[in-house]
Amino acid sequence: MLKPTKNFILNLKKQKRENKSLLFLDNVKIIKDALANKTIKPECILTSLDSLPFEFEGEVYKVESSIIEQLSDTKTPQKVLCIACLSQYVVEQPKTNFLVLDSLQDPGNIGTLIRTAKACGFEYVFMLDCVRKQNSKLIRSSVGAVFDSKVYEMSRQEFIDFVNKHNLSLVCCDMNGKNIFELKFDKKIGVVIGNEGQGVSEEIARLCYKTVKIPMKSGIESLNAGVSGSIIMYQINKDLF
């Protein structure tokens, strides 16, 4: 293992503040999965352990636990910290059902939805003007699924052009829509989940060929975005289970 200089650590702290495209991963399972899927490009790993609990051929620095705590976003980080950037890939036409997140801002909701999408066979996720997928809370709440799915970040206009180019079918959730439990879907579709406070934007809603709703007892205005999106995805893919 290498011994870092004081300037090396200071530079990492500066990059943490200024370079929002960098990832600081402090969960061993998430690091292992991301490395295995080749969805990140690791720059180095810091650890307070005598040896890493997984194979890694890059630079490894032995540091005090306090250094990892200073660079981590969690209160009780594990003893391994991977500094990396996301691998770049070309946006491809979905081959399965897919999820569309329209300007969601809660990283916990986004992480939950990405994880659920993976479980439901929705292999593609389109994030339109959302919190960045490098967000540490998003990564933790997805339990690393953000590195195991095709997650694309783009603007609304870019997505609109993409939908029109590939003639994709979308559905969105609306209180005036049809009961999701009474519908069957016989083609590949994208499920649109809107902003926590404003719902689906007008531009994206116009692309949807159908609106659906989750029936609820009176007195409940709406469900959390993560909950409603999960229910809809499971219902659409129920025949797969």
Task: Give short role names for the model-derived ranges.
Residues 118-120, 138-145, 202-241:
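Structured adenosyl-cofactor binding patch, chiefly the S-adenosyl-L-methionine
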Residues 1-4, 25, 61-64, 149-157:
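Short acidic-hydrophobic, aromatic-tinged amphipathic segments that line or gate anion-handling sites
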Residues 55-66, 96, 187-190, 209:
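Active-site regions of enzymes building and remodeling cell-envelope glycoconjugates
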Residues 172-220:
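Active-site/ligand-binding-proximal alpha/beta "capping" segment
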Residues 92-176:
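RNA substrate-binding interface of SAM-dependent RNA methyltransferases
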Residues 63-64, 102, 128-129, 150, ...:
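Short beta->alpha connector loops at strand-helix junctions that form conserved
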Residues 60-85:
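Glycine/small-residue-rich loop that forms an oxyanion/phosphate-binding "nest" at active or ligand-binding sites
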Residues 1-49, 130-131:
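Boundary-proximal intrinsically disordered activation/regulatory segments immediately upstream
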